């Protein structure tokens, strides 16, 4: 990392969080998935940012805002990916002209995604009511094949949503984005890819991986015995909607 701040005390605070969380997880049972919430940071001066980024780089799964499903899924996918190119992600905004999605999070994007050397920076965070947190800032990698994966609770079953994506480089510098990020294009295309994600109930938290394949995730879901929804280059939205409807009937009759 490079140091982009003189506020060393803020960085040291994050180092304390990283050491403490890692030690707690190892001593209390070897946990490999963690969550936090910006509204429940009792005793902490900052939202863990740099700390969580480093822990993800070591293979921990992380779920923001208490998202335990993503933490668990991330831990499994980190293992599958040998701790490379995998981590928490969130849809931030769409570029309707280029048909791309900018993915990021308030702090905790894994440096496994870094295409540029991550820089430690300190900026205000207008949520949570805590002190300015340290975080790593970088531009994300490009990769022709990647997946964005969401796990949702359907009430009577879990659904694993797997979407093929292409990671692309930033079209230009983003000096006002003080976090790490990724950009991607949806399969089969922007319009149908976004529609399919919404129809399937895809959440805004995902685990993105440039290492784990869509087929591996489909196989994993089948091994777990849960519903798997795949969105790829062959997806046709009208047929996709029918498939979701029939799957709902089938899964309800499996109980």
Regions found by a protein language model. Name each.
Residues 44-49, 99-103:
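Short acidic, glycine/serine/threonine-rich loops at helix termini
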Residues 133-255:
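Extended hydrophobic packing segments that form well-structured cores
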Residues 37-44, 94-96, 213-214, 238:
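Gly/Ser/Thr-rich loops at beta-strand to alpha-helix junctions
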Residues 59-179:
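C-terminal catalytic subdomain
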Residues 1-47:
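A charged, amphipathic alpha-helical module
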């Amino acid at each position: 990392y490079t140091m982009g701040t003189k506020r060393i005390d803020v960085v040291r605070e994050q180092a304390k969080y990283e050491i403490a969380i890692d030690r707690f997880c190892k001593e209390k049972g070897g946990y490999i998935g963690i969550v936090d919430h910006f509204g429940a940071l009792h005793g902490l001066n900052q939202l863990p940012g740099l700390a969580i980024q480093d822990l993800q780089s070591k293979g921990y799964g992380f779920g923001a805002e208490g998202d335990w499903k993503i933490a668990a899924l991330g831990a499994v996918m980190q293992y599958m990916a040998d701790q490379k190119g995998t981590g928490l992600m969130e849809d931030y905004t769409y570029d309707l002209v280029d048909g791309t999605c900018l993915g990021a999070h308030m702090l905790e994007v894994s440096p496994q995604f870094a295409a540029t050397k991550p820089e430690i920076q300190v900026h205000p965070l207008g949520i949570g009511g805590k002190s300015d947190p340290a975080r790593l800032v970088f531009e994300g990698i490009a990769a022709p094949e990647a997946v964005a994966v969401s796990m949702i609770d359907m009430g009577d079953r879990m659904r694993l949503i797997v979407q093929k994506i292409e990671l692309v480089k930033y079209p230009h510098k983003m000096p006002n984005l003080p976090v790490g990020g990724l950009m991607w294009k949806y399969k089969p295309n922007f319009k149908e890819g976004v529609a399919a994600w919404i129809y399937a109930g895809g959440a805004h938290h995902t685990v993105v991986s440039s290492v784990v394949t869509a087929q591996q995730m489909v196989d994993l879901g089948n091994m777990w015995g849960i519903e798997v929804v795949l969105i790829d280059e062959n997806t046709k939205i009208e047929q996709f909607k029918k498939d979701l409807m029939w799957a709902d009937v089938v899964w309800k009759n499996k109980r």
